[in-house]
Structures are given as structure tokens and as C-alpha cells.
Amino acid sequence: MKQAMPRWTSNDAATAAAYGELARLHGPFVLVAHSQGCNFAWTMALAHPQQVRAIVAIEPSGFPQVGDAALAPLRSIPQLMVWGDHLDGHPLWSQLRPRLRAFAQRLRQCGARVDDWDLPGLGVYGNSHMLMMDDNSEDLALRIDRWLADQGLMVQPAQS
């Protein structure tokens, strides 16, 4: 099996509260989220847009269920969605991915920059749902770093 997605829905309130506390105590920051965590990242960005410089959503499995007008706080936050292999043959992903593409289009319509990377379409193959654990994870991290740099968000480390 190349795609699996565990679901923990009983801790949604605690997770949302933790994201809110993160926004209150720290920031600004770039949110890098995966799967179920992407919904929390977007929800937190809606509540605290001044704290979020960008969102990187790796194989997102959900998004905030809000109207188009409520998406306005996200218009100044660049966003990247990253998709790996083996999605088309999985019943859940064949339903989720079109919904996420529609969500990305709604974000664009409100003025947000949303880049959508289909890794196989970019010539990158062999990824599971856990892209950060795959053999090419370092290459993917470098690609994301370049995307962040293109947004003006990378800070060069101090020379020792």
C-alpha cells in the first residue's frame, strides 16, 4: 500500500487551541503542515493572519469549511500545496484532491497566491503519503526551501 491516512478526530479542539496558543506566543512564522494538520494550519491562519508568513500544505486532507468572504485574511499569505504519487488509485484521495483543488481556486479568487505542485507532473516519482519520510525527502525539502526563498522568506544562517 502506498497511501494510508490515519484519522484522529477526537483531539480537534485541543489541536486548534494549541495552534492558537502558538500564534499568541510566537511568530511570525511559516506553517508547514501535513495531511489532517493542514486544516488546522489554514484555520489558525484565518484567525491569526498577521502571524503567518506562508503555508506549505503537504498532501492536505481537509480545509476550513467557510464561505468565500471568510477567506479574505489568507489573501496576503503565499501558499503551496504538495502532492505525491499514488493518489488517483485511492478512493479517499480521488474524492479529496478535487475538493482541495477547488479550495485552492477559491483562495486564488480572493487574491491569494496558491501554488500547486503535482510531484509526478514535475518529474518527481516514488512518494507515499508520508513525503517527509520518503527516500527523496531531502530533495523535496530543498524544493520547498527554494519556494520559500522565492517568497522572500528564507533567512541566510549566520556565518561562524
Which residues fall in each region the model found?
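The feature captures the conserved acid-bearing segment of alpha/beta-hydrolase catalytic domains
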Residues: 57-119
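Cap/lid segment of the alpha/beta-hydrolase catalytic domain
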Residues: 1-10
